[in-house]
């Protein structure tokens, strides 16, 4: 069994929904009066989709104990999907009936994704307002800058390590 990471699923699901056409932000946990969600996707139409990413049965079971059941009290979410590796298909009884299921399979070329079950559309859904979309896009750009800062920090550490290694080689 080829283990699939959360990060691999995030990037594949973002490509699947079309990150060139949608606002897609990972790890929404504040600022929108919304429960935590792994990926929030806002389509050109203004409707939102939540994608929960689960890579283990224990993570999936723990999700059922959170109490919010992935229901947006403000009806901004049109659909809910759970993205799971193919080796977790035997755990779908923990996924709410109204949720769609995306299954990811790792192969030599990357990850394939298929829809095991389509999500039920929230009939009371409403579009995100321009202000809400701007706030979500702002959260997404904050993620980018934090990621760049982390990458730069790693680059500095690597450069320092290379200099130290060269110094060690000169000593011997």
Residue ranges and their predicted role:
Residues 1-7, 11-19, 95-172:
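Non-catalytic C-terminal interaction segments of nucleic acid-processing enzymes
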Residues 17-32:
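A short acidic/basic microdomain associated with nuclease active sites
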Residues 37-50:
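Active-site beta-strand-loop-beta-strand hairpin of nuclease catalytic cores
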Residues 74-108:
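Nucleic-acid nuclease catalytic cores
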């Amino acid at each position: 069994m080829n283990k699939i990471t959360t990060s691999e699923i995030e990037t594949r699901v973002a490509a699947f929904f079309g990150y060139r056409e949608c606002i897609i932000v990972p790890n929404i946990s504040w600022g929108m009066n919304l429960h935590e969600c792994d990926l929030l996707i806002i389509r050109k139409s203004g409707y939102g989709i939540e994608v929960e990413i689960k890579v283990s049965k224990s993570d999936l079971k723990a999700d059922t104990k959170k109490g919010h059941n992935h229901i947006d009290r403000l009806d901004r979410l049109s659909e809910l999907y759970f993205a799971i590796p193919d080796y977790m298909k035997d755990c779908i009884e923990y996924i709410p009936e109204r949720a769609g299921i995306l299954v990811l399979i790792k192969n030599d070329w990357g990850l394939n994704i298929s829809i095991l079950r389509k999500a039920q559309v929230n009939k009371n859904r409403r579009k995100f307002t321009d202000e809400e979309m701007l706030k979500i896009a702002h959260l997404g750009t904050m993620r980018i800058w934090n990621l760049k800062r982390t990458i730069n920090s790693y680059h500095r550490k690597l450069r320092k390590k290379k200099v130290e290694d060269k110094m060690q080689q000169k000593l011997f």
